[in-house]
């Protein structure tokens, strides 16, 4: 369930700040801290605030395509650690435990909520590469220093927020609106500009363990080849 009221209870620290000066930390792909994370997600909001609360999505294909070939090759050699310690902290503060049995896959067990995946991932449906290590689940680029890791993770988000043409924004109109997206190559965030209640249901399916196919291509390369035929 997606609930603004539940979020205020579970993550009270988030809502106690006087002035909100940046919302870029909201960008993420769903449950990338699992060894087998989500492929598709479905979201329906059944209770909407009077104004605000839009959802934004951004293209991981396009983030990858905006990098130089040299940087693309460098990032393809890296892995990242994905984790969500805030969930465990919230569970401890609020007196419940993280579900530690199989969460949709035999590999998604335990309460650590931590996994290692490539920085650049191939989408098995399209065969295109995208930057995967984006958002608040991506904690550390493993093969570089801490300073270099933070620089890269912040830069990936910066590429999203400074390029509106790789984003799409949806204004929820009524309880029958449904959004479906592919977490393997798309990031999303809510827009926290509302005061009313925002409630809904989200379901995710599980895909495969993220991988990089060295024979895969970029979206831009694939479209250029299609044009030349």
What residues fall within each predicted segment?
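Fe(II)/2-oxoglutarate oxygenase catalytic core
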Residues: 1-180, 184-229
């Amino acid at each position: 369930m997606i609930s603004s009221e539940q979020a205020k209870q579970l993550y009270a620290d988030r809502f106690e700040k006087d002035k909100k000066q940046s919302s870029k930390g909201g960008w993420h792909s769903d449950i990338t801290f699992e060894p087998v994370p989500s492929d598709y997600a479905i979201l329906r909001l059944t209770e909407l605030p009077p104004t605000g609360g839009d959802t934004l999505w951004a293209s991981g294909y396009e983030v990858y395509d905006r990098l130089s070939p040299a940087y693309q090759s460098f990032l393809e050699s890296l892995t990242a650690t994905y984790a969500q310690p805030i969930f465990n902290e919230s569970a401890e503060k609020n007196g419940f435990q993280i579900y530690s049995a199989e969460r949709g896959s035999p590999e998604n067990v335990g309460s650590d909520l931590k996994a290692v995946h490539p920085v650049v991932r191939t989408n098995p449906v399209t065969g295109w590469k995208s930057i995967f290590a984006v958002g608040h689940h991506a904690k550390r680029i493993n093969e570089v220093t801490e300073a270099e890791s933070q620089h890269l993770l912040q830069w990936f988000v910066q590429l999203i927020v400074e390029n509106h043409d790789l984003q799409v924004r949806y204004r929820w109109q009524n309880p029958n609106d449904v959004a479906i997206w592919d977490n393997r190559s798309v990031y999303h965030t809510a827009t926290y500009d509302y005061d009313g209640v925002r409630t809904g249901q989200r379901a995710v399916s599980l895909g495969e363990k993220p991988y990089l196919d060295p024979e895969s291509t970029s979206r831009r390369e694939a479209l250029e080849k299609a044009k030349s035929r």
